[in-house]
Amino acid sequence: MKLWLWVAVGVWMLMAELGTIETAPRRDGTRPSVSGARPQQVVNRLFFDYPDSDRASLLAVARFIGEKPITFVKTDSSPGLFQNILVGTLVVAFFFLLFQFCLHVNFQKGA
């Protein structure tokens, strides 16, 4: 890159750090680009703050946005077997890597 380009980037970064130029528009300082446009509507947060177990609210929101709701049925099988297999695999992998490390490391001084 040429020196003048680096100088321009440095000046721009300095001005952005000092606050003399805006790097992104602020919400309260923006105006609508079309005359007669309404300001942005505030989203009602309480409508969206619902627990995942509230099936009626989930179905209502799914219908509102036009999705086909998917419901998952909890089965009687416990995740204990899968969790035991996963933890056992991770432990075996850890000891295998530790064994490989100890096998290839030479603890003698000098080389």
Curated annotation (Swiss-Prot):
Residues making up the signal peptide according to the UniProt record: 1-23
Effects seen without this gene: Deficient mice have no overt developmental abnormalities. Furthermore, no deleterious effects on testicular histology and sperm morphology are observed. However male mice are severely subfertile, their spermatozoa show impaired ability to fuse with the oocytes.
Keyword terms: Cell membrane, Fertilization, Membrane, Secreted, Signal, Transmembrane, Transmembrane helix
Tissue: Testis-specific.
Transmembrane segments: 85-105
Entries under PANTHER family matching the protein: FERTILIZATION-INFLUENCING MEMBRANE PROTEIN, RIKEN CDNA 4930451I11 GENE
Protein name: Fertilization-influencing membrane protein
Annotated gene: Fimp
